[in-house]
């Protein structure tokens, strides 16, 4: 089964709602329409930007999709500061990032919480982008494959085959996020192949063949084609390189060249 690559920008805590409009406009207009037939292009934006991006995308019928960077595991109630999946669904979010290493580190998010957030998203028709990845000491010890497979298993706990079919996994080695260090294409392939093997175990060959596994961690326009060209890497979760619309369009075009 041919998997259409997904290039998803993770803006993190950058760009206000006015800047968001300009960035998405530049992205959409800088990427020729035929490229959208080869790759899916998305932005995951701060909560305060979502409504502005939705209005632009739907009003101008842009091919870019959008989503959020986190979601509550709860549906509603006395959870100050939280945003529910149903609220995101009302804004027509297609995606939500869960379990990013920055959430795991700064907010002490566990694999169990990540799985609950993924479940909440799926229950509201939103595809979670479930992030996993090893720290430097695990990589240096040579146990990174086992570590990431087990982390992925726990972060997907409770999801059935249908839910897994609507899930995206992003492999982001923690030591490569925002550091300028990039895992080699072979490194990315090694871990993504192992993740796909886990999905075979959990949900069968058909789901595993259709599920998209992204690489994240200092992805740049110059490196994306080689990484996405690997047999088990189906796109990228892009941080800093997604903050400039035209530069992100170039990155997506380079990914499309190997699709």
Curated annotation (Swiss-Prot):
Enzyme class, spelled out: isomerase
Pfam families: TIM (PF00121)
Residues annotated as catalytic: 100, 172
Catalytic activity: D-glyceraldehyde 3-phosphate = dihydroxyacetone phosphate
Enzyme Commission code: 5.3.1.1
UniProt keyword annotations, A-Z: Cytoplasm, Gluconeogenesis, Glycolysis, Isomerase
Listed GO MF terms: triose-phosphate isomerase activity
GO CC field: cytosol
Compartments in which it is found: Cytoplasm
Entries under InterPro entries matching the protein: Aldolase_TIM, TIM_sf, TrioseP_Isoase_bac/euk, Triosephosphate_isomerase, Triosephosphate_isomerase_AS
Residues that coordinate or bind substrate: 10-12, 178, 218, 239-240
Location, primary (coarse class): cytoplasm
HAMAP family, alphabetized: TIM_B (MF_00147_B)
Family note: Belongs to the triosephosphate isomerase family.
Subunit and partners: Homodimer.
Its job: Involved in the gluconeogenesis. Catalyzes stereospecifically the conversion of dihydroxyacetone phosphate (DHAP) to D-glyceraldehyde-3-phosphate (G3P).
Protein name, per record: Triosephosphate isomerase
Biological source species: Corynebacterium glutamicum (strain R)
Gene assigned in the entry: tpiA
